[in-house]
């Protein structure tokens, strides 16, 4: 569409900032861990020291930590308590929280949507952490950026960087 000035129409020009890719992203407010793939099994793997450091880093940075799982609540709460103790995880969402305990519904991203709802944020302010590449599809179904991360590489800064890079790539 052209610009009309003094009775004449001329071609509209775009400004450089209209053509540039977005270089900012929303502030990371929460990291949602997939308990089924990202959290170690205490009985077999032992407590993950690196995971505790990562969660403490997120907690100190003011970033909420949430956990989702397709397993029953009692089992997941026990796992989280053994790994992280009490008070560091903002919310735990399990298959028991769904209207119908259906694994297919849980794998469609509904657990992540429910976690976002409980935290009161949108997918733009969260990052999902999974422990396997196959598990990346579930948070993506909920519109969440997701990363497959080795817990030894996880910190508040690395989560913020991964979140920012993911949204910038989406805008490009």
Model-derived features: where do they sit?
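Asp-based, Mg2+/Mn2+-dependent phosphohydrolase catalytic module
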Residues: 1-37, 52, 56-59, 63, ...
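Conserved ATPase-coupling elements of RecA-like P-loop NTPase cores
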Residues: 41-47
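Conserved phosphate-coupling serine/threonine residues in phosphotransfer and NTP-handling enzymes
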Residues: 69-71
